[in-house]
């Protein structure tokens, strides 16, 4: 019984860690998208891939 509880606890901790990593990745993508659409900000790493058309 002791090993079952410790194995269950480790599995739960592992699942929470996976969830946390996925949450960070998704949140990072959302922040970048919101920065671009709301503030027209492009991160420095992406500047070389962007073309600007129709400057006034």
UniProtKB/Swiss-Prot annotation:
* Superkingdom assignment: Viruses
One Pfam family cited in the UniProt record for this chain: Ac110_PIF
- Name the chain's protein: Uncharacterized 6.7 kDa protein
């Amino acid at each position: 019984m002791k090993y079952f509880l410790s194995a269950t606890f480790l599995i739960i901790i592992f699942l929470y860690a996976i969830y946390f990593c996925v949450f960070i990745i998704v949140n990072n993508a959302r922040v970048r998208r919101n920065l671009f659409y709301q503030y027209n900000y492009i991160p420095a790493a992406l500047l070389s891939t962007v073309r600007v058309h129709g400057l006034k």
